[in-house]
């Protein structure tokens, strides 16, 4: 899971190039302010926070050394501010996805983890569920008392490889907010976790020179020439090719939206060569026919 040359394309370069934020024993006022900003950014999913919404009492306790970073994280995650942003308006499975992302820096590994937190929330309430993340061995081993939680894109002992791919269904770029995504309150991983499958990584739109393609949520790609009765091409297979950044003579230099074409299998190689000659980039190739 190490991030190398693909970091900028995946939108994780800022995290790859920075160190975890820690409040050391001899911290200054500026150090405390930096930690407070980092906690708000992480736990509130990079959502904008007004000055009147800040938890001034908890901030003072942290600045005075009365509470640790872990307890400040706990206070923010249990606050009415957090509930208004992520609990009240979301399905519970989406809330669990966000709790994993905000507090443990990863995506859920399996449906069992989601079921565990669903049961805990139903039987003991939201605060107890938040405690289960922050009091976990996983949290303590990775962040301890004074490190601000961060997105864990690198492999660690006990991690599962599915976590890397699924994290990019939750993380949509450094400047993205968890409350400003197109899919809004719907769960990102419920289908994958229920079917025990993993989808391909689709990078943030800003790093792909346009919106990257995502297949239908229903998963019902039409068969045989996009639903027709007559197969198109010998193999009866069609592919949707999404193209971006064509820069050949005659094309305007202003930024353009992506272009998608439907190509039969036997013409796919020829089409890719033509795109390359025009200076374009292939954003995605996905089946448009199931037969």
UniProtKB/Swiss-Prot annotation:
Pfam family, one: PBS_linker_poly
GO biological process: photosynthesis
InterPro entries: CpcD-like_dom (IPR008213), PBS_linker_dom (IPR001297), PBS_linker_sf (IPR038255), Phycobilisome (IPR016470)
Membrane topology: Peripheral membrane protein
Sorted UniProt keywords: Antenna complex, Membrane, Photosynthesis, Phycobilisome, Thylakoid
Presence of keyword Hydrolase: no
Source domain of life: Bacteria
Domain PBS-linker residues, every copy: 2-179
Transmembrane as UniProt keyword: no
Localization: Cellular thylakoid membrane
CC per GO annotation: phycobilisome; plasma membrane-derived thylakoid membrane
Domain named CpcD-like: residues: 236-288
Oligomeric form and interacting partners: Part of 2 PBS rod complexes, the conventional CpcG-PBS rod and a photosystem I-specific CpcL-PBS rod, both of which include ferredoxin--NADP reductase (petH). CpcG-PBS has on average 3 stacked phycocyanin hexamers (PC, CpcA and CpcB). Linker CpcG connects the PC stack to the thylakoid, the hexamers are linked by 1 copy of CpcC1, 1 copy of CpcC2 and the stack is terminated by a single copy of CpcD. The CpcL-PBS has on average 5 stacked phycocyanin hexamers (PC, CpcA and CpcB).
Record family assignment: Belongs to the phycobilisome linker protein family.
Function field: Rod linker protein, connecting hexameric phycocyanin (PC, made by cpcA and cpcB) rods in the phycobilisome (PBS). PC is the major phycobiliprotein in PBS rods. Linker polypeptides determine the state of aggregation and the location of the disk-shaped phycobiliprotein units within the phycobilisome and modulate their spectroscopic properties in order to mediate a directed and optimal energy transfer.
Descriptive protein name: Phycobilisome 32.1 kDa linker polypeptide, phycocyanin-associated, rod 1
């Amino acid at each position: 899971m190490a991030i190398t040359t693909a970091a900028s394309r995946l939108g994780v370069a800022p995290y790859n190039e920075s160190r975890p934020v820690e409040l050391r024993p001899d911290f200054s006022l500026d150090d405390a302010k930096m930690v407070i900003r980092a906690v708000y950014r992480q736990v509130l999913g990079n959502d904008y926070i007004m000055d009147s919404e800040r938890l001034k009492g908890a901030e003072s306790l942290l600045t005075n050394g009365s509470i640790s970073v872990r307890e400040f994280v706990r206070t923010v995650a249990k606050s009415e501010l957090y509930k208004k942003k992520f609990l009240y308006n979301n399905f519970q499975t989406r809330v669990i996805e966000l709790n994993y992302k905000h507090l443990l820096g990863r995506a859920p590994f399996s449906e069992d983890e989601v079921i565990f937190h669903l049961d805990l929330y139903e039987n003991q309430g939201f605060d107890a569920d938040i405690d289960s993340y922050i009091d976990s061995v996983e949290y303590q081993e990775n962040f301890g008392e004074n490190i601000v939680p961060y997105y864990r894109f690198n492999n660690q002992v006990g991690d599962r490889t599915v976590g890397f791919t699924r994290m990019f269904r939750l993380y949509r770029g450094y400047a993205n907010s968890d409350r400003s995504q197109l899919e809004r309150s719907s769960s990102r991983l419920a289908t994958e976790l229920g079917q025990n499958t993993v989808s391909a990584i689709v990078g943030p739109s800003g790093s792909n020179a346009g919106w990257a393609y995502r297949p239908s949520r229903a998963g019902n790609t039409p068969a045989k020439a996009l639903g027709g009765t007559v197969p198109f091409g010998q193999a009866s297979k069609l592919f949707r090719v999404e193209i971006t950044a064509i820069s050949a003579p005659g094309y305007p230099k202003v930024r353009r939206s992506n272009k998608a074409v439907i190509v039969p299998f036997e013409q796919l190689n020829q089409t890719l060569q033509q795109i390359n000659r025009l200076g374009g980039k292939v954003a995605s190739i996905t089946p448009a026919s199931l037969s």
